[in-house]
Amino acid sequence: MLIQKKDGFKFGVDAVLLSHFSNVKKKHRVIDLCTGTGIIPFLLEGKYSPKDILGIEIQDEFVDMANRSATLNKTHNISFISEDLKNLKALKNIDKADVITVNPPYKLNNAGIVNPSDKLAIARHEIMCNLENVIEASRILLKDNGRIYMVHRPERLADIITLMRKYKIEPKRIQMVHPKLGKAPNIVLVEGQRDGGAFLKWDAPLYVYNEDGSISDEINKIYGRDVNE
């Protein structure tokens, strides 16, 4: 059970796809950046049961809801803190992670109509942190050879690769997600490795819907649904 406000920010398919794309082991310490109300840590716990998960979020109200969800679900290995990813000095005092996951704000601060609700605007627009802040913070928080898994928009892929390399995080794997066959991708999943060697793998693309509008078998499997029903 996840505590969220009815009129607040809600998680979507992006969080589910990111948790599926991430390679997490039981021995791993995981940090989820821009965690919001904590959906990705709870999905990772249900799927992989890692040793420890820390969610970092700048909005105190979201952190409070996430910690109450952890208490409600009796997940003792998940915790949440309020911190600004631009506060690099504070980040250096946090125990480093084997894996970082992040579903960051997608929209540039000067792009599109900004939501009048500050909380929703911060979740969707690069107001409190931008893509470079996220990747620089990841460099600090990752162990040597640790991995970052990010979900974003395809139009930002060039920025993601450029910034990862700037902070010595090597892009290792990319997967495009399309609404359906014949449509341009609208989601990109990226894996990077701190101080990794140069080798990039492309996963087969994912299609969310079939031609008839039904949900694809691939997506049903990711959600744990029986595709034979």
Could you describe each region identified by the protein language model?
Residues 1, 52, 77-79, 170-173:
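Conserved beta-strand segments of alpha/beta enzyme cores
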Residues 9-11, 34-37, 182:
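Short glycine/threonine-rich catalytic loop with a Thr-x-Gly-x-Asp
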Residues 21-113, 136:
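Conserved SAM/SAH cofactor-binding pocket of Class I
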Residues 47-48, 93, 182-186, 200:
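A generic structural micro-feature
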Residues 104-133:
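Mobile active-site "lid"/loop adjacent to the S-adenosyl-L-methionine
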